[in-house]
């Protein structure tokens, strides 16, 4: 397999750090190696499969949930109950009205981030891949679309690519609710893991991922189990 290393650029999550990526550089066979690369700490954004390669900084840790062992916490059970009126629908096609919800979400909640301002081209660049068709987990409330979890379906795992939702419903914790639905769907499909991207302990935006227990983190080139007793 062939890999490339990106130029350094300002880190999106730790303001005083520079980020460098190790990128899978083969023009073909992405589908063949994607799951193996995920198991080695990589992640997909659009057509690109990458992992952090930042020299002295090791803050980014790939994180995944072994779904058969997961049990929701009391707080997560409350979120499930709070959203019991939401209908979950699976779609294999991107739909035109997804973008308007994405634009509203980015322009309301992430004005300080690298994805602002939202554009259709930017949405397509991370959600779509010319070698993989993701699964779209739709959240509906009273007949209205209020959330989308873009999810990759692999042979033995699901991977959470990106979730966006109606920003006026912040009290419903729809991001956490979407992950709970992804775990449930992974169990139903007999998958082993749900990949959640990267955990960065010093980044407040990432803290919700720590709450899905037990989980595994890719540390020093191997997956290490984190359970309640480790906190």
UniProtKB/Swiss-Prot annotation:
InterPro entries: Acyl_CoA_acyltransferase (IPR016181), Asp_Glu_LeuTrfase (IPR017138), N-end_Aminoacyl_Trfase (IPR030700), N-end_Aminoacyl_Trfase_C (IPR007472), N-end_Aminoacyl_Trfase_N (IPR007471). One of its GO terms (molecular function) is leucyl-tRNA--protein transferase activity. Its main location: cytoplasm. Its EC number is 2.3.2.29. GO terms for cellular component: cytoplasm. It catalyses: N-terminal L-glutamyl-[protein] + L-leucyl-tRNA(Leu) = N-terminal L-leucyl-L-glutamyl-[protein] + tRNA(Leu) + H(+); N-terminal L-aspartyl-[protein] + L-leucyl-tRNA(Leu) = N-terminal L-leucyl-L-aspartyl-[protein] + tRNA(Leu) + H(+). One of its GO terms (biological process) is ubiquitin-dependent protein catabolic process via the N-end rule pathway. Pfam families: ATE_C, ATE_N. It is found in: Cytoplasm. Coiled coil: none annotated. Keywords: Acyltransferase, Cytoplasm, Transferase. Belongs to the R-transferase family. Bpt subfamily. NCBIfam families: PRK01305.1-1 (NF002341), PRK01305.1-3 (NF002342), PRK01305.2-2 (NF002345), PRK01305.2-3 (NF002346). HAMAP family: Bpt (MF_00689). Functions in the N-end rule pathway of protein degradation where it conjugates Leu from its aminoacyl-tRNA to the N-termini of proteins containing an N-terminal aspartate or glutamate. PANTHER family: ARGININE-TRNA-PROTEIN TRANSFERASE 1, ARGINYL-TRNA--PROTEIN TRANSFERASE 1. This is Aspartate/glutamate leucyltransferase. It comes from Pseudoalteromonas atlantica (strain T6c / ATCC BAA-1087).
